[in-house]
Amino acid sequence: MTIYLTELDTTSIEFPSPFDALDEPNGLLAFGGDLSPIRILNAYSQGIFPWYGPGEPILWWSPAPRAVFNPKTFEPSKSLKKFQRKHNYRVSINQATDRVIGYCSSLRPEEETWLNNDMQAAYRELASLGFCHSVEVWQGDELIGGLYGLQRGQVFCGESMFSLKTNASKIALWYFCEHFTQFGGQLIDCQVMNPHLESLGAIEVDRDEFLSSLRLLKETSVNDACSKKQWLKEMP
């Protein structure tokens, strides 16, 4: 079967409507363009994100349904709370964004990373411009887990997470949900559901609902203090 896709013009940052995305493969919308900050920010503001593998052109996606967290209602399990009381992992914001992106790009067993050098460079540039943020989890002075993503108003678009020690990424998400809510955050976009996200309480919403929420929430900023370098959990 022939697939017809829009090729993005390198002189324009415009995208097709997310409602034009293919059903199969789910959410594929366009190809080409570049990974400039202005294009990526425009994409995320419309519920579109880049994802492509080795040897492929830049591919742009807007899948349906969409996996999301409501940070207000996120509830860590009793076992996770007990684990954290015992281990006292430290948690920070934007203390090691480059390293978090680097760890997230590391190859997983039997998997080729989608987070290639160009993608890493793009997110690092967005971090330097104040749009990409990270959460870090530490055991003492050792970075053991974290997550990163882009913020568009009251929406945090989660990109990737990693764990080098048990429960580290879960703790990153837990503390970030509490922190983001405190500053007015309303929605965390996880893009596509997987068993790990589902186990943490992510839900799926249809494209209409997600894009409607995004259009509304991206227009209201959270306080700048939300993303300043800080510690959410220090050693007792």
From Swiss-Prot:
<keyword id="KW-0012">Acyltransferase</keyword>
<dbReference type="InterPro" id="IPR016181">
    <property type="entry name" value="Acyl_CoA_acyltransferase"/>
</dbReference>
<keyword id="KW-0963">Cytoplasm</keyword>
<comment type="function">
    <text>Functions in the N-end rule pathway of protein degradation where it conjugates Leu, Phe and, less efficiently, Met from aminoacyl-tRNAs to the N-termini of proteins containing an N-terminal arginine or lysine.</text>
</comment>
<dbReference type="GO" id="GO:0008914">
    <property type="term" value="F:leucyl-tRNA--protein transferase activity"/>
</dbReference>
<dbReference type="InterPro" id="IPR042221">
    <property type="entry name" value="Leu/Phe-tRNA_Trfase_N"/>
</dbReference>
<protein>
    <recommendedName>
        <fullName>Leucyl/phenylalanyl-tRNA--protein transferase</fullName>
        <ecNumber>2.3.2.6</ecNumber>
    </recommendedName>
</protein>
<dbReference type="GO" id="GO:0030163">
    <property type="term" value="P:protein catabolic process"/>
</dbReference>
<dbReference type="InterPro" id="IPR042203">
    <property type="entry name" value="Leu/Phe-tRNA_Trfase_C"/>
</dbReference>
<dbReference type="GO" id="GO:0005737">
    <property type="term" value="C:cytoplasm"/>
</dbReference>
<dbReference type="Pfam" id="PF03588">
    <property type="entry name" value="Leu_Phe_trans"/>
</dbReference>
<comment type="similarity">
    <text>Belongs to the L/F-transferase family.</text>
</comment>
<dbReference type="InterPro" id="IPR004616">
    <property type="entry name" value="Leu/Phe-tRNA_Trfase"/>
</dbReference>
<keyword id="KW-0808">Transferase</keyword>
